């Protein structure tokens, strides 16, 4: 089996690329970073530090790389069995034209073996969004053929991959946590379902997408925002602060109550999942900076994201949400010289006041009780 993976960054190499290569799939990375491309093509291997209770070093081997903006990537799309991405939500639109060209070439060459495309991004139904961009870039006469022969498979991914400490000397070395979760929508595949260790198949993807968003992402963000306010440097330092831990755990329990109502998750199993995530935040090997995790607060405070979406669920089911409110107030305080969104957030609050600013960012009603609760909590943190 042959696969092409867009995005040779830390997540591409340390998570999806590693799972594909470990499964014995012939893997080619596509990227724009020439330093990384050259290193991959010179060595055809790289090291992954897998860190949990202990640290182990795995070697990923037998890999190649091509530029994601050249002709080689188009040729590969015409030949491979699987295309995956880990490029970041914004970049999906940029890689769509190359994918479209490759699909046209595949059709012209008469290659009717099924091709499945899986976007492995931190977003809801990312592959469906990628499909929209690809379809827009396709000529009309290729669209029906693509619908018939190409599967666009949505997925949920979860693995913490911090910036590597050794990035200065080896552009390929990467550190990842032991935990990894890659859940894909089995109803969207064309042809036989793949058997890739570490890839889980489900016919109820949205339950798992929201479980991850409402637990890992919600908890991670709140840990970062409250940690930064308290002067902590890393996620580990922040979650070991008992006051912060109580709010983070409480927020994950509040969002968890929504998931249990909505999807019928088992309460005891979900409590164990929360404990596992708290343990991941404590990982001493992951020097995960609160500023990195907190960045892009406008996106993280938007209606469909990790803070407001679970809050809306608590309103829908008349459930408590006081810890989620604390997290939202913490996010409103996030300041970073390196993050344009943090600066925009500060300017918006200075200009309009916290009430109108939060309403604008989150689409919540400015006169609602929850906005009033969040503003009270925000002011109490000053």
Curated annotation (Swiss-Prot):
EC annotation from Swiss-Prot or TrEMBL: 1.1.1.17
UniProt-listed Pfam families: Mannitol_dh, Mannitol_dh_C
Keywords per UniProt: Acetylation, NAD, Oxidoreductase
Enzyme class label: oxidoreductase
InterPro entries named among the record's database cross-references: 6-PGluconate_DH-like_C_sf, 6PGD_dom2, Mannitol_1_phos_5_DH, Mannitol_DH, Mannitol_DH_C, Mannitol_DH_CS, Mannitol_DH_N, NAD(P)-bd_dom_sf
Gene Ontology CC entries for this record: cytosol
Positions of modified residues (N6-acetyllysine): 269
Entry binding sites for NAD(+): 3-14
Origin superkingdom: Bacteria
PANTHER family: ALTRONATE OXIDOREDUCTASE-RELATED, MANNITOL-1-PHOSPHATE 5-DEHYDROGENASE
Family: Belongs to the mannitol dehydrogenase family.
Protein name: Mannitol-1-phosphate 5-dehydrogenase
């Amino acid at each position: 089996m042959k696969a092409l993976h867009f995005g040779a960054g830390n997540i591409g190499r340390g998570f999806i690329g590693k799972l594909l290569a470990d499964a014995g799939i012939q893997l080619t990375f596509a990227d724009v970073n020439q330093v990384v491309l050259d290193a991959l093509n010179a060595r055809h291997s790289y090291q992954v530090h897998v860190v949990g209770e202990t640290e182990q070093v795995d070697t990923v081997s037998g890999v190649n790389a091509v530029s994601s903006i050249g002709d080689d990537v188009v040729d590969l799309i015409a030949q491979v069995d699987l295309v995956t991405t880990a490029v970041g939500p914004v970049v999906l639109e940029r890689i769509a034209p190359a994918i479209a060209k490759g699909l046209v070439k595949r059709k012209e060459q008469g290659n009717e073996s099924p091709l499945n495309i899986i976007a492995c991004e931190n977003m809801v139904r990312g592959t469906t969004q990628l499909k929209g961009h690809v379809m827009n870039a396709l000529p009309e006469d290729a669209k029906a053929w693509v619908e018939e022969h190409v599967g666009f498979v949505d997925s949920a991914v979860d693995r913490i991959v911090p910036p590597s400490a050794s990035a200065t000397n080896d552009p390929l070395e990467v550190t990842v946590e032991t935990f990894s979760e890659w859940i894909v929508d089995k109803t969207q595949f064309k042809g036989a379902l793949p058997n890739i260790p570490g890839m889980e198949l489900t016919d109820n993807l949205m339950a798992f997408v929201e479980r991850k968003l409402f637990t890992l992402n919600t908890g991670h963000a709140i840990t970062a925002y409250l940690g930064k306010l308290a002067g902590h440097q890393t996620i580990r330092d922040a979650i070991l602060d008992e006051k912060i831990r109580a709010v983070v755990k409480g927020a994950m329990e509040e969002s968890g109550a929504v998931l249990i109502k909505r999807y019928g998750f088992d309460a005891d199993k979900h409590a164990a999942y929360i404990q596992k995530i708290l343990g991941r935040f404590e990982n001493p090997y992951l020097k995960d900076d609160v500023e990195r995790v907190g960045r892009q607060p406008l996106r993280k405070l938007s209606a469909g994201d990790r803070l407001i979406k679970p809050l809306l669920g608590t309103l829908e089911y008349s459930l408590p949400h006081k810890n989620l409110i604390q997290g939202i107030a913490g996010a409103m305080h996030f300041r970073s010289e390196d993050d344009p969104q943090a600066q925009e957030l500060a300017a918006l609050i200075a200009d309009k006041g916290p009430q109108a600013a939060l309403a604008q960012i989150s689409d919540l009603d400015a006169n609602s009780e929850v906005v009033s609760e969040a503003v009270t909590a925000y002011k109490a943190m000053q």
